[in-house]
Amino acid sequence: MEKNEEFFDIRELISIMLQAFSYIDEYAKKVKEEKVENKMFIKEENEKFTELDYLTQTLLVNTIHKFYGNLNIKIIGEETLNEEYNKIIIDPNNEDKKEFLSSIDKISKDINFNFPPEFNLDSKRLKKINNSEISFFFDPIDGTKSLLKKKYYPVTTLLGVRIDNMPFIGFIHFVFDKENKTFFNFPTLGIYEYNPLLKIFDKKEIKSDENKFNFAISSTRATKEMIDFIKTFPNSEYENESGLGTKMIKCLLEDKIYFTTGKNSVGLWDICAASCLLNEIGLDIYCFNGEKAKFIPKKIYFDSNGVICLTFYKFKIKCFI
């Protein structure tokens, strides 16, 4: 290894994020049990977010800066962190919030997880990053619409990491799930699930039938025509709930077809996190014009006036806009 070479240790990143997710889960549990208040706010274009969204993003941003601030990094999250919201939401006199945000001090880059043996190969876990731009894209709480209705299962934290212009590693973490599972890809080795209760990493067998369609659809409006179209598919389920991460995992692991509506737009964080996992099993996301989805650092990647559709078919995925 040359003296000036810089490497990105994937196991280290996974360790850091799994620790961060565990603290998010602890605070989210208090929200669910109504031990802490979770106020709602409305930002531009009538988009709603809660204190849990904002606090989670603050923790993730600070964690990334703590461990990777010395690298050429770019961070893009769904929520906008600013002084106005800091004064309202991050109350230094609130012990629960103070404890949650101070949990960053407990997060370590030490690799304390019992990774599978295949994760230990230097050629697999180290990525050369000399002069590379490392971008972190995340939706701190994907499924706010469901959360506000106290429907917790669709709620996830999405994190996608891009090195230069290529999606590299993605995380889909189930915040309110009773087992708080995390799904992620380990580049070149497949898709894994981490169960913090059992403390094990499980490589997932992806269900794929080239003659079958699986859909995860988001739309700005659930029209009668669209719902009628959905009903024409056998073994389909329609859910008027948010949570792209949940639908992604269901489509990959279950022998069902899932539909969801109600999302106003798809952020870069959604596309990047999903692409990292899908690329791992030989799938790509394509735009309607047939081009592969690009990862351009904009606030919103796609504005959907119609239907966004991830189509699993013959090992291709198309994103219809």
Walk through the language-model features, giving the residues of each:
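An extended, acidic
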Residues: K204-I321
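Detector for glycine-centered tight turns/loop "hinges" at secondary-structure junctions
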Residues: K145, N165, P196-L198, G290-K292, ...
